[in-house]
């Protein structure tokens, strides 16, 4: 019997998450998937001002190290470094730099079997795969995608996510998520053919308790042979 393949997954952080902080936030999931998947974390290219960052993002009053600097993938206002997933916007300022960051990671850190995104990172992961499905050579389609607290990105000039996505997908979201309400994640899931959903009773985080473990493993095991 052939040894089980360890899947490599590029994980895109949420808005206002540092690379180190995102690694810590995915620690429970990393433990759950030990031996099944290697998670490679990536944060956005744009520093988020300290005034807009969560309290306690940096360990002291000095400047953040690159790994501790809260970052984002794009901003939803032209003049301010802020982001709202729920407000209608005509702006995705910094999105091209975000796409370049992901393309560079795929090229230099890959190959990867799948993509995982959390919150704003989930919206970006879905957009990246839509671009890949449309033929963008920077983004070869992965074998699967996992979207946690995802949403359809607003402000895109092209309605690329209107086309059904044929990529195998797992959509994870909380019933009491106040940052990204569950209906936003369900709307994103509806853009994927044969989408698998995993719901939990909590809020805005990546669940990895024993009750969710089997759902992750069942989804990933189909790609491990």
UniProtKB/Swiss-Prot annotation:
It catalyses: a carboxylic ester + H2O = an alcohol + a carboxylate + H(+). It holds the Pfam family FSH1. It comes from the Eukaryota. It comes from Mus musculus. Exhibits ester hydrolase activity with a strong preference for long-chain alkyl ester substrates and high selectivity against a variety of short, branched, and substituted esters. Is able to hydrolyze ester bonds within a wide range of p-nitrophenyl derivatives (C2-C14) in vitro, with a strong preference toward substrates of >8 carbons. Keywords: Hydrolase, Serine esterase. The keyword Hydrolase applies. Strongly expressed in kidney and liver. Moderately expressed in brain, skin and testis. Weakly expressed in heart, lung, small intestine, spleen, stomach and thymus. SUPFAM superfamilies: alpha/beta-Hydrolases. GO terms for cellular component: cytoplasm; nucleus. The active site is at residues 119, 177, 204. GO terms for biological process: response to retinoic acid. GO terms for molecular function: hydrolase activity. InterPro entries: AB_hydrolase_fold (IPR029058), FSH-like_dom (IPR005645), LovG (IPR050593). Its EC number is 3.1.1.1. Belongs to the LovG family. This is Esterase OVCA2.
